[in-house]
Amino acid sequence: MFDFFISLINSAIYGLYNVTVAIGFPSYALAIIFITIILKVLLYPLMAKQMKSMMNMQEVQPKLLDLQKKYANNPEKLNQEMAKLYKEYDVNPMAGCLPMLIQMPILIGLYTALREYQFEPIEHATFFWVNNLNAPDPFYILPILVGISMFLQQKASMGKNNEAMENNQMMKTMLYIMPPMMVFVCLALPAGLCLYWSIFSLLGIGQQMIMNKQKEKQMAIIEARRAEEAAKKAEEEEERKKRQ
C-alpha cells in the first residue's frame, strides 16, 4: 500500500516536471512547489473544518463548565452529556490533529520518494544554491527556513490570543521547541523535502491570516450570543425574584 503511495508521488513529480518543461522552465524544484500548492488547496477544507470546530468549542465552553459542576460526582453521566453537547454543536475534540495526521504520511512518502528518485536530467534538479534535490542543503538555508516558517505559522495560528496561548504548556512546546528540533532533523533530509516543508509552512501562514479574520468575525458573533444569553438569564432571575 505504501509502495503505491510512493509510486503516486513519483508520478506526480514527473508529471508536474513535464508541465514545467511545457511552460519553458524545466525544474524539478518548481514541480515540488506545484505539488505543495496542490496539497495545500486539497487540505484547506480540513483546516476550515478544524477552525469551525475550534470556534464551536469556544462557544460551548460555558456550557461544558456548567456540566462539569452539575455532574462533578458522576463522571459517566458527565461524559454522556458532553458527548451530546459536542454532537449538538458539531464539535470534534480531535479535529486539530487531523491535518497533522494526514500530513505525516505525505512527509514520509515524499522523504522516501525524493531520497530514491532518479532526477533526469540532473541539471534540472537544482534550486539556486542546491545542486541536487536528493541531497541535504549544503548551506543549511532550507532547514533554517523550515524552522522559521514553522515558528511564524504557529504564531499566526494563535491569532490575537498570544498571551493566553503561550501560557499553555503544549503550545509553548509547539512554538519554541518544535521549530529548532525540525531544523536539526532537516539538516540530514533531502533538500527537496525541506523545500516542500518550508513552502507548505509559508503558504500556511497566509492561509492562517485569512482564517484569523474569519475567526474574528465568528468570535464577535459568539460574544454577541453570550451577551444575549447572559441578559436573558439576568432577566429571568429578576422575574423569579419579583415572584418571590
Please provide the spans of the model-predicted regions:
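Helix-loop-helix
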Residues: 1-244
